[in-house]
Structure formats: structure tokens, C-alpha cells
Design a protein with these regions (language model features):
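Flexible "cap/lid" loop of the alpha/beta hydrolase fold
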Residues: 110-111, 116-149
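Conserved alpha/beta-hydrolase catalytic His-Asp/Glu region
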Residues: 149-202
């Protein structure tokens, strides 16, 4: 993978596969979104590299990328994604996102339509009548509890066992960096317990702001977006079907996929056709 250094010191790793019209992939697994997470997902759009230039990336809190000790910001991760396209000289691309980073794909559609040819949302997260913010805040409960009850040394020790936050929430959202860069532990220690806990809360609230149904953009922005959207509904509290349905209703140029987890091969066919029609 290639590495891009961002103004705030973050490093973003990305890889280019295939040739053809550009498609940016934003992987599943929440904060732990790295290109490798496509390996075990029910559908792997990297196979589109047989017809398209596919760009994969590790988001700043995952994989080989690195993030500073700062709250999560949808603006920051969106800027990372734009920066990857810029360094590759890509003026516009289609965007395929799964899970949490559908929020970034929506920012492409709503805030950068000139850079966005089409957008595919696979099982987007968000709020509807079937869930509450507690569903998303729960991911951080163990992080806060571990630091408060056991202290920062226990957080650092937890990170040594597993660098993937969604599988090791006690270690906090910087666990991939603590795992791979032992010297980073001193930066965590220097915060002190209470400041670290406050930072976790700010990180959580930045990732899942209570006042935005889709987390990164508001409903009016979605209503005003004209970029073609293909949406695959989820079927659980984290990925409610109602969120996909509301997006389909709000957006002016959106369609729902026929296939989903029940038929990933058919879903890939739908995605391929959608990209070909909107490139």
C-alpha cells in the first residue's frame, strides 16, 4: 500500500487495483474500517477491479493508517478520502461504502457532487424507529469502563492483544496504533485517566452525533442531493432497514438494490451495472 501524510499528522494507507473508471471503496467494520475488512464481508467489491480502477484504503483509525489522539470527525475522514483521490489525480469517482462509512459516502454525494459520479451504500447505519443512540454508544461503553475502573495501563495492555477496536473495545479507538507503535503508549499515558475518558466521550459523540439521523449529513442535504444512489438495506439495530428506506425516500435519485446478504453474487451484478450506467 502507498502512504499519504495529512496536515494533522495522520497517515493514510491506500492501494490501487485494476484499470478503468475510478471507484473508491470505504470498507465495513465501523471505526476499524481497513481494506482487509472486505476479506470477511458478505460482498467484496474489490472484484470490480476487472473493469474499474478500484481504490481501497485504511481509514485513519484502522489498519496501517495512523490517527492522532483527537476526537473523531466526519469532516476529517472525508478530507482524508478526498486527499487520496487528489494525490492520484482523480477528479471524480464512484464511491462504494459499507456499514459506518456510508456516512462518508453520503458526504461525497451531498457536499462534493462534482467529485462523485455515483454512490453505493451497503447496509448504512443511522437512526430510525427501531433503534436509539444507545445502540451506537454501546461500542464505547467498554472503552470508558476499562479506563475508569482499571486505568490507562490496562488500556495499553489490552491493545497489545488485538489491534482491531470493534473486536477489542476495552483498548479504545487508538488500539491499532498502540499495538503497532509501542512508543505511542506514552502519549496516551500523558493524557491522564480523566482527560482520556473525556476524549473517548468526544470521540464517540463525533462519530455518532445525536442530532443527525445519518451522522455525517442532515436530511435536508440528502433531499437536495442529485448524485445517483444505490442502497442495500441492513436488517439489524446497527443497520436498520428503515434507514435505507428513509434515504431512498429523501434522495431525489436513489434506488434500493433487489439483492442483499441473501444473494451477494446478484448484488455485485447490480452494483456493476449501476456503476456502468453512471460513469
Amino acid at each position: 500500500m502507498q502512504e499519504l501524510i495529512r496536515p494533522d499528522g495522520s497517515t493514510i494507507n491506500y492501494e490501487v487495483l485494476g484499470s478503468g473508471e475510478p471507484v473508491l471503496l470505504l470498507a465495513p467494520r465501523g471505526i476499524s474500517s481497513s481494506a482487509a475488512e472486505w476479506d470477511n464481508y458478505f460482498v467484496d467489491p474489490r472484484v470490480l477491479a476487472d473493469n474499474f480502477t478500484v481504490i481501497t484504503m485504511d481509514q485513519r483509525h484502522a489498519g496501517a493508517s495512523r490517527a492522532p489522539l483527537a476526537p473523531f470527525s466526519h469532516n476529517d475522514v472525508f478530507a482524508d478520502q478526498i486527499a487520496v483521490l487528489n494525490v492520484l489525480g482523480i477528479q471524480s469517482a464512484s464511491v462504494i461504502a459499507a456499514d459506518f462509512y456510508c456516512a462518508s459516502a453520503l458526504k461525497f454525494a451531498c457536499e462534493a457532487p462534482a467529485r462523485t459520479r455515483s454512490t453505493v451504500l451497503i447496509e448504512p447505519m443511522g437512526l430510525d424507529d427501531s433503534n436509539t443512540m444507545d445502540v451506537y454508544y454501546a461500542v464505547f461503553n467498554d472503552s470508558i469502563r476499562q479506563a475508569r475502573a482499571e486505568g490507562l495501563e490496562s488500556v495499553i495492555s489490552a491493545a497489545e492483544t488485538n489491534p482491531i477496536f470493534v473486536d477489542n473495545t476495552e483498548a479504545g479507538p487508538w488500539c491499532h496504533r498502540l499495538h503497532d507503535q509501542p512508543g505511542f503508549a506514552q502519549a496516551v499515558r500523558s493524557l491522564g485517566r480523566e482527560t482520556y475518558i473525556a476524549l473517548l466521550v468526544d470521540f464517540r459523540d463525533g462519530a455518532f452525533p445525536w442530532d443527525k439521523r445519518y451522522f455525517s449529513v442532515n436530511e435536508l442535504e440528502v433531499c437536495n442531493a442529485s448524485v445517483p444512489l444505490l442502497i442495500t438495506p441492513g436488517n439489524d439495530e446497527l443497520h436498520p432497514a428503515g434507514v435505507a428506506g428513509q434515504l431512498h425516500k429523501d434522495a431525489t435519485n436513489a434506488s434500493l438494490s433487489v439483492a442483499g446478504r441473501d444473494n451477494p453474487d446478484k448484488l455485485l451484478e447490480e452494483i456493476r451495472k449501476f456503476l456502468q450506467e453512471n460513469n
